[in-house]
């Protein structure tokens, strides 16, 4: 029987480094059936981001745009911070940093998001730098697809952190709660300073994106609508050329993010409940459940190094 890792006692705070333990407390089974108020989610993410910038004397938000769902939704949040707090004169700088493994669909979607949401933006191709670093690293040991992907992620972060340094800003993180719990991110790579969406499961990020292009940016001729709609429908990849089908292709082929989220939440809440564990095993297959949970356990070491995340209970209507 799989058992839940003991939860540490944490003080309630807006920002927590080990975000999952505090977030999971607000996802009780009987409450999780209630609909999330995505207006409240979005407004909270905008206001908390602005508060953090102001409190720490920061003037710019730096975001690497991949063209995917998470970075596009984060871009919409940053855009709204600039719009709602003009007196602070915040700057939102977006940069697309592709290598040869990024698809044309991703690059086009990133371009849409930059033009729609950023106060300043550009594209910087890092393929030449990647090949140079890769060749240097391979002088002693051969690289693997994962190590090559990590080089790309870390090169991007070098670029973004340098930009944050010279503009008095911080680097925005775009990982979601599903990725945090599966370890689908690179230490010193795509994990950054501050994460507005880190308390949302992946399927909830989809719902937030849908809310934005159906309730907030509703003009179909507007770049904001087009960017969000494109990101909502884009084919998921890992952005580093490791696995063409993205996260789900690696651990749960044929399953959706919502199903994987159900596996993770059930295990983390009810890992010692035979009936609940049997439910997910029957629903998704014992092999799939074990693959997901093995990935979660093996990535535990990564979750010791987390960015600042907006606490879920500030916007979750299930609280």
Task: Give the predicted meaning of each segment.
Residues 7-13:
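Polybasic, lysine-rich low-complexity intrinsically disordered segments
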Residues 27-63, 73, 77-80, 84-151, ...:
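ATP/NTP-dependent adenylation/nucleotidyl-transfer catalytic domains that generate, transfer
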Residues 68:
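Conserved G/P- and acidic residue-centered "switch" motifs that form tight phosphate/ATP-binding loops
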């Amino acid at each position: 029987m799989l058992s839940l890792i003991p939860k540490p006692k944490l003080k309630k705070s807006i920002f927590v480094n080990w975000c999952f333990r505090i977030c999971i407390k607000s996802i009780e089974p009987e409450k999780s059936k209630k609909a999330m108020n995505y207006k409240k989610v979005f407004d909270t993410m905008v206001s908390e981001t602005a508060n953090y910038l102001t409190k720490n004397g920061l003037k710019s938000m730096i975001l690497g745009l991949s063209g995917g769902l998470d970075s596009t939704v984060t871009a919409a949040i940053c855009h709204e911070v600039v719009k709602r707090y003009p007196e602070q004169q915040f700057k939102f700088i977006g940069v697309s940093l592709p290598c040869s493994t990024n698809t044309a669909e991703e690059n086009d979607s990133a371009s849409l998001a930059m033009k729609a949401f950023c106060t300043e933006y550009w594209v910087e191709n890092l393929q030449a730098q990647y090949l140079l670093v890769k060749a240097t690293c391979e002088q002693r040991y051969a690289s693997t697809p994962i190590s090559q992907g990590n080089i790309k992620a870390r090169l991007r972060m070098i670029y973004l952190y340098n930009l944050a340094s010279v503009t008095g800003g911080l680097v925005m993180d775009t990982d979601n709660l599903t990725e945090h719990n599966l370890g689908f991110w690179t230490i010193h790579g795509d994990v950054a300073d501050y994460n507005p969406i880190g308390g949302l499961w992946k399927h909830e990020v989809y719902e937030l994106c849908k809310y934005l292009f159906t309730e907030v940016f509703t003009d179909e001729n507007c770049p904001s609508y087009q960017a969000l709609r494109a990101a909502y429908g884009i084919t998921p990849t890992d952005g580093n050329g490791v696995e063409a089908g993205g996260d789900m292709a690696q651990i749960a082929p044929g399953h959706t993010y919502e199903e994987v989220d159900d596996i993770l939440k059930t295990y983390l809440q009810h890992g010692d409940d035979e009936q609940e564990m049997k439910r997910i095993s029957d629903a998704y297959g014992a092999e799939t459940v074990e693959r997901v949970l093995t990935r979660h356990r093996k990535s535990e070491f990564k979750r010791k190094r987390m960015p600042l995340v907006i606490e879920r209970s500030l916007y979750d209507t299930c609280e």
